[in-house]
Amino acid sequence: MINTNDMFYAKSSDAEIAEAGEYGGAVTTLLKFLLKEGIVDAVLAVDSSADLYDVVPILIEDPEDVVKAAGSLHFGTLNLAKVVTRYLDGAQDMKIAVTVKPCDAMTMVELMKREKVNADNVIMVGLNCGGTMPPVKGRQMMEEFYEVDPDSVVKEEIAKGKLIVETEDGTEKEIPIDELEDEGFGRRTNCRRCEVNIPRMADLACGNWGVIGPLAGKATFIEVCSPKGAEVLEKAKEAGVIDLEDPIPKGIEIREKIDGAMVKLADKWQGNDWEDKAGREIFSVLTEYMDDFSRCLKCYGCREACPICYCEDCCLEANNGPDWLSKGEIPPSPMFHLERMLHMVESCTNCGQCEEVCPGEIPLAKIWHEVNAKMKDTFGYVKGTGDEKPPIAYFPVGK
């Protein structure tokens, strides 16, 4: 009997999927099984569109199509929680399995607390994540550092602190992530600061960290994180679609060491990005960025991209706003940003969506991440975990 907190090395029983998927195709097999058995109505994942740098959400209803979404896409920066609420009605009337990075999973949990996502209808298959990369700079990085045509890259992966790319002719090149980031490339800045790499708030947490011995590179390390995850894995095992074996104890230790090293690296980047990390109060953080806020065009891009912003009638709109929000001014009053902060910052998961779409290049993710960290210190609230309600959240009727 599989239980919460159990760990396994897993690989697909289907040789074709094991070859097409990464690390034994365990995730692909689980998603296909869930669809084929009617446990879910659809699978929400990501797929490449024009190329590896153009990553889009994909809703899969045919089990045979699941393999199309197999493999890593580190240039995929979108947050799938936004897709669930905006286009799938929060899974209110359909059952879905969603592949989630840690920030996706944490956002889903926050939206479940607000009853914007039906937790009973969602299975979260978590994927370990050490960070994603901005696609435009990614193409530039391929030309300048790897000296290859960006369009010739057919595969990329992050392993042992290096970004490894493979081109059409089978050539592999690798460069340490640290070297790329020292030059302003590599992972997104919000990903560098992120201290959550294993999505234990999902139902299953899957990745290649800790798989050693004969199955190294041929199996997925799966940690069971919820009773729902245990039930899914048990059913897949009983159906014979997935092979499980106990992980090597040394592998468990290695996995924890990798996670610990990534957390330390995130702490370093937080120290680099945030002045006086331990000492500043919340409002002094906002004061620090007034010059940045002066570049705001009031385009509402941050609101539209933020997966935590979901109100149908937004108080930031001129006809809905309170008296202290000035109307028709560009840039808007700092109260514009303060009002938005009060609505979402305790649940900010540092997914970086706001910063990516800002035409004024305001470092929004950096600002809100720092404020969120201050709120954690003040209230002890950890976003994206458990079922505790956010400390200052309010949920207007009808929103």
UniProtKB/Swiss-Prot annotation:
Protein origin, superkingdom: Archaea
Pfam families associated with the record: FrhB_FdhB_C, FrhB_FdhB_N
EC number: 1.17.98.3
Reaction(s) the record says it catalyses: oxidized coenzyme F420-(gamma-L-Glu)(n) + formate + 2 H(+) = reduced coenzyme F420-(gamma-L-Glu)(n) + CO2
SUPFAM superfamilies: alpha-helical ferredoxin
Record keywords, A-Z: 4Fe-4S, Electron transport, FAD, Flavoprotein, Iron, Iron-sulfur, Metal-binding, Oxidoreductase, Repeat, Transport, Zinc
Xref: PROSITE patterns: 4FE4S_FER_1 (PS00198), 4FE4S_FER_2 (PS51379)
Sample GO molecular function, one term: metal ion binding
Protein name: F420-dependent formate dehydrogenase subunit beta
Gene: fdhB
